[in-house]
């Protein structure tokens, strides 16, 4: 793993979710409290996967890259956000934390074409169009290149996604997670996420404050 400290953190929410999700708010609150010097960004993603990634790439255009000395970025993604985070990590070479990540998003969301409401604001609706399935397929990562760059938090109790697919995708060649946990229970939302937040932030290798 690279030893360059992380100075910028991106959080990507899941399908029908928002920056107001419980996990996103927990991370944002902890970053503001303990790591105020770190740049933290959690955007509201549009329904179109192509537009979502175009917007993210614009947002992070001036963030540290692989060639930036002494600084690095990292990404956290939940569910569909984990799918996006994986694509972004492969594009940029950054560290990634994936929380019950979608592995076959195009397949899984092909049944979700139509109108939906946000989990956190039922009055906020959006249309998930058929062409978005192909946009998801274009972002697929058949195999991650460096498992050591990923921390995966996977719940066997996930009622939405197949934990075995997640484990197979993020494990090393011996079938084990180099970083992360396979939870025996929990659920898709990872309701016990506060129990693992410190571990997640430790993995990110956040830059220590100048006064610390």
Regions found by a protein language model. Name each.
Residues 5-69, 187:
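Active-site catalytic motif of lipid deacylating hydrolases and related acyltransferases
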Residues 35, 67-68, 92, 173-175:
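A structural signal for short coil/turn segments at secondary-structure junctions
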Residues 87, 91:
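Active-site signature of alpha/beta-hydrolase-fold catalytic machinery across serine-
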Residues 76-81, 85:
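Gly/Ala-rich beta-loop-alpha elbow adjacent to hydrolase catalytic centers
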Residues 10-15, 76, 153-155:
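Short hydrophobic segments within beta-strands
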Residues 3-4, 63-71, 145-146, 206-211:
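Glycine-rich phosphate-binding loop signature in dinucleotide/nucleotide-binding domains
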Residues 8, 72-74, 95:
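Structural motif
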Residues 94-212:
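The alpha/beta-hydrolase serine catalytic core
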